[in-house]
């Protein structure tokens, strides 16, 4: 017997108890708070959340009755890891990628971005070391990430 689609329309204000289900989402999927998704065990859910900001790993969602708790997790994605021989070279790479509005995850020694052949060529031409990896992607929110239009 097929389970009914679980409609998630509530963001829980504080992290509650253990979640019943995990919902792995890519960075792009976390920015869209409406639509059909699948939990890690294959249960279909329908997001119908208020448009008040992107979802973050660790956020917990619920149905209107509060009978199900679903925790958002960061899904594994194909990424490029960028390393440089100096902090300045790494900052320059971040600057050039930022000019192209590329989502970046920033660390002291490296940058992560979604895999992209054109950007990989540009970065390699600047002398940066690239490696491909599969891991959750948690990009910076951007200058206006917390801004709400009212």
UniProtKB/Swiss-Prot annotation:
Main location: cytoplasm
Gene Ontology annotations of biological process type: protein folding; protein-containing complex assembly; urea metabolic process
CDD domains: UreE
Single annotated GO MF: unfolded protein binding
Subcellular localization: Cytoplasm
Gene3D superfamilies: Urease metallochaperone UreE, N-terminal domain, UreE, C-terminal domain
Assigned keywords, A-Z: Chaperone, Cytoplasm, Nickel, Nickel insertion
Family membership noted in the UniProt record: Belongs to the UreE family.
Protein name, entry field: Urease accessory protein UreE
Organism: Parasynechococcus marenigrum (strain WH8102)
Lineage: Bacteria, Bacillati, Cyanobacteriota, Cyanophyceae, Synechococcales
Gene behind this protein: ureE
């Amino acid at each position: 017997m097929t389970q009914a689609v679980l409609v998630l329309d509530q963001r829980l204000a504080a992290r509650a108890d253990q979640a019943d289900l995990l919902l792995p989402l890519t960075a792009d999927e976390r920015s869209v708070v409406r639509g059909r998704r699948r939990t890690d065990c294959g249960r279909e859910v329908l997001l119908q959340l208020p448009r008040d900001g992107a979802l973050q790993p660790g956020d917990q969602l619920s149905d209107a009755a509060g009978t199900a708790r679903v925790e958002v997790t960061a899904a594994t994605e194909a990424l490029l890891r960028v390393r440089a021989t100096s902090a300045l070279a790494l900052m320059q790479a971040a600057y050039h990628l930022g000019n192209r509005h590329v989502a970046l995850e920033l660390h002291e020694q490296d940058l992560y971005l979604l895999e992209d052949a054109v950007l990989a060529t540009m970065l390699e031409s600047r002398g940066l070391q690239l490696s491909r990896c599969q891991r959750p992607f948690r990009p910076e929110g951007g200058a206006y990430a917390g801004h709400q239009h009212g």
